[in-house]
Regions:
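Compact, charge-rich alpha-helical regulatory domains located at protein termini
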Residues: 2-108
Length: 108
């Protein structure tokens, strides 16, 4: 069963529907840049689950050595799109609607 986790950026919140497969996905599967990948590894993160379970906000990534704004943007964007691509096609539209509502872009 999926577990819903909300992670916020500076001004945008994202929902992650975590399942066992996504939790155990290695960052190598996301095609991150060498800088972003190395920064996460040095901080002790090797899987999506390890990262999502230990941060409340993407801005926390900036505290990691060599993980500046560009890396934070890349990591957060790739996580969002990777998770989205793993959803079944029938769940994708509802997911986007839920994210828009969470951010106040769509009425409840």
């Amino acid at each position: 069963e999926d577990i819903q986790t909300v992670v916020k950026g500076k001004s945008f919140k994202v929902i992650f529907y975590m399942n066992e497969a996504l939790l155990s996905t290695d960052f190598a599967d996301m095609d991150l840049s060498v800088r972003s990948s190395n920064a996460l590894k040095r901080a002790g993160y090797h899987t999506i689950g390890e990262l999502i379970e230990n941060i409340e906000s993407f801005s926390e990534l900036e505290k990691i050595k060599n993980c500046g704004k560009t890396s934070v943007y890349e990591i957060s964007g790739r996580l969002f799109f990777y998770q989205y691509s793993q959803l079944s096609k029938d769940k994708r539209q509802q997911y986007l609607m839920d994210v828009l509502k969470l951010n106040g872009i769509m009425p409840e």
